Design a protein with these regions (language model features):
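A short, polar/charged loop-to-alpha-helix boundary motif
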Residues: 223-238
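Thiol/selenol-based redox catalytic cores and closely related redox-interacting motifs
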Residues: 164-224
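Short active-site neighborhood of thiol/selenol oxidoreductases, capturing the structured segment around
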Residues: 94-123
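Generic structural signal for well-ordered beta-strand positions
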Residues: 92-93, 215
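N-terminal targeting signals for export/organelle localization
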Residues: 2-78
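Structural microenvironment flanking redox-active thiols in thiol-disulfide oxidoreductases
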Residues: 118-172
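Short loop/turn microsegments at loop-to-beta-strand junctions
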Residues: 79-80, 102, 202-204
Length: 243
């Protein structure tokens, strides 16, 4: 069932998340923090809504044509069951890994995207800080395992990269949309031939507890606006008592 849409996904914030969210609001980001689900006092309700009725959204192969029309999982919801190939090509049980340690889960388009490459580098800079807080860092893209390895080697990444070459994970998270026409040949190639529908994920960041519940998210259809490493670290720090 289609959820209510907004171009910028801002919703209710618990008081513990308010400070980090207040800063992030200026990035035209995406927040969902359902105080009712988390049983926390509601500090503020922040909305920037250009509501789109579900029956007006144009769809193809089960996903919207526009990134603004995605229907992502909300804070308080649980992540789906997922097994994805790692850079080595071996199957990685995401749910098992999340159950062992609180997780910062990042969806990016691919190593070919300059904005994604910059984001990956920023994540590497704070990876030790995040692990010191008790988190693990996992990033997922449309790249094939071979291309994930290239990204890891080129940028000297020490955290886990997973391949969502067929966009199955992005679809389950509700962040997949139809890629622009200029990507028609490019996307199947970088995915190892698996992205036959030429889809892309909206760049997203999720903070998860060990139960697999989403505690925080940043989702922005504007591919140039990524959650900075410093702000991610601040958000992660603010949630330490809840993980």
């Amino acid at each position: 069932m289609m959820k209510t849409k907004t171009q910028n996904y801002l919703s209710r914030l618990s008081w513990k998340n308010f400070l980090a969210a207040f800063i992030l609001i200026n990035l035209i980001g995406v927040f969902h923090s359902n105080a009712a689900v988390l049983n926390k006092p509601l500090a503020s309700t922040l909305t920037v809504s250009h509501a789109v009725k579900a029956d007006t959204i144009k769809m193809t192969v089960g996903v919207p044509l526009k990134p603004e029309d995605i229907s992502p999982l909300l804070v308080g919801e649980s992540i789906p069951v997922l097994n994805l190939p790692s850079a080595s090509g071996k199957s990685f049980d995401l749910n098992k890994s999340v159950a062992e340690k609180p997780t910062i889960l990042v969806f990016y388009r691919g190593g070919w995207c300059p904005f994604c490459s910059k984001q990956l580098a920023g994540l590497q800079e704070i990876e030790k800080d995040l692990t010191g807080m008790g988190y693990q860092l996992i990033a997922i893209s449309t790249d094939s395992p071979e291309n994930l390895t290239k990204s890891m080697d080129k940028q000297k990444l020490s955290y886990t990269l997973l391949s969502d070459a067929d966009l199955s994970a992005s679809k389950k998270f509700g962040i997949a949309f139809k890629g622009p026409k200029g990507y028609d040949k490019f996307l199947p190639e970088t995915s190892g031939g698996k992205n036959v529908d030429k889809l892309l994920p909206v760049p997203s960041v999720f903070i998860l507890n060990k139960k697999g519940n989403i505690l925080f998210e940043y989702i922005n259809p504007n591919i140039t606006q990524r959650l900075s490493a410093d702000l991610l670290k601040a958000a992660a720090s603010s949630l330490r008592k809840e993980i």
